[in-house]
Amino acid sequence: MASIIKRKNSYCVVYRYTDEKGESHQRWESFPTNAEARKRKNQIEYEQDNNVFTVPEARTVRELLVDYMEIYGVNKWAMSTYDAKNSLINNYINPIIGDIPLSDLNPRMMEKFYLDLLKVKSKVINNRKPEHEYLTPSRIREVHKLLRNAFNQAVKWEFMTRNPVEHATIPKEKPKKRAMWDLPTFKKALELCDDDDLSLALNLAFSCTLRMGEMLGITLDCIDVSEEKIENGTAFIFIEKELQRVKRDVFEKLNKRDVIFVFPRCLSGGNTVLVLKEPKTETSKRRVYLPKTVAKMVLQRIKDIQEIKELLGDEYHDYNLLFSSSTGRPMEGQIITRALKKLIRDNNLPDVCFHSLRHSSITYKLKWSGGDIKAVQGDSGHARADMVTEQYSHILDEDRVANARRVDEQVYNQCPSKHNLTVITV
């Protein structure tokens, strides 16, 4: 007997068969329509009833990944994650090992595949020029994580008896030092910035530890900057959504998952849509308290928006956004990025990306709070505290110098002679 299971935009025929060794296996076959799935189900049942069922040919990596994306990816991933995984498969996996039968895979072959990827040129994705000419160990690690999970699913579905990359060795990745501004540089950038949008973005990103999409997705109903709140230091913003541009096919494939609002297109055509969506994790939904200075900036921005609304009337596209164009349309990340690059170029500032302000924020909040990881995690929205400690527990040079000085003062200056020691027994 076979059964049909509906999976989002596909239909899976699930059945069991016995191989030539007499061992029973389960198999999933994916089809785009219910009619095709029913046709295949009837064929399987007819052949099994008449003892003419042919044992399925060995599946290839490409066929497995189709099922993996349809059954696992569609149900588990956010739109940006689905798109990123799909790019890895189409650009770096299928062209090289896509046609290899699963039964032929072994750990040695997969380790050689990972080494060969170091010689593969990086692809241009979404019109973005890659940072490196060839694939880096960090990108190969992403490929490995995807394949490890896909092969685990294959074992679960009984397509494979073992995972060939479970213990595979991958190219060693050198830790990459994050480029970020120290506090004096950040303060200098604020003084030099004469772009109102960028100035507010810099202040919010640093003081509230925000991701770009979270900041651009802030709506006025998620802000409390009343005079009373500002005065007693409890003004806040509530992060519950983010602005993101996603591919239309992924948007439809995932059935608009996590999407709160779809912005109307300015121009006809196009293969992307701009949306407000749920943040990446539940812990990303959070209340972040504003410093008084920043709260006053936000309050002034709200007043400016109200004046523009009254001036333009019906010509203003009111989406209730804190960051918007002069006509109310959403402000996308590239506008802030271009303004930041101009500020850096015009004033010979250290070259950093906008996301680095989040790293700077976390670093200094850890420093100022004496390492209060939970408090910093509350602002950053990281899912686990260890994500903060692993990525941001580095100490600024000035603190390291101070630590050495403290050791000198507390230990060696109080021990005038190394021969005059007291032994403490515990």
Task: List where the protein language model places each region.
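N-terminal DNA-binding module of tyrosine recombinases/phage integrases
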Residues: R7-K112, K303-H317, D397
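Active-site/catalytic core of tyrosine-dependent DNA strand-transfer enzymes
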Residues: Y17, R265-V275, P279-L349
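Short, polar N-cap/turn motifs at the start of nucleic acid-interacting alpha helices
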Residues: C222-E231, P350-D351, G370-S393, N420
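C-terminal secondary-structure termini that scaffold catalytic or DNA-interacting sites
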Residues: C222-F236, K241-E282, V294, R405-V426
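Catalytic-site neighborhood detector that most strongly recognizes the C-terminal catalytic loop/helix
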Residues: K172, M180, E231-T234, K241-R245, ...
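C-terminal catalytic core of tyrosine-transesterase DNA break-rejoin enzymes
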Residues: K156, N203, S207, E214, ...
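N-terminal core-binding DNA-recognition domain of tyrosine site-specific recombinases/integrases
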Residues: A2-S3, Y17, E70-W157, P175, ...
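Basic, Lys/Arg- and aromatic-enriched nucleic-acid-binding interface segment
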Residues: N126, E133-P137, R141, K156, ...
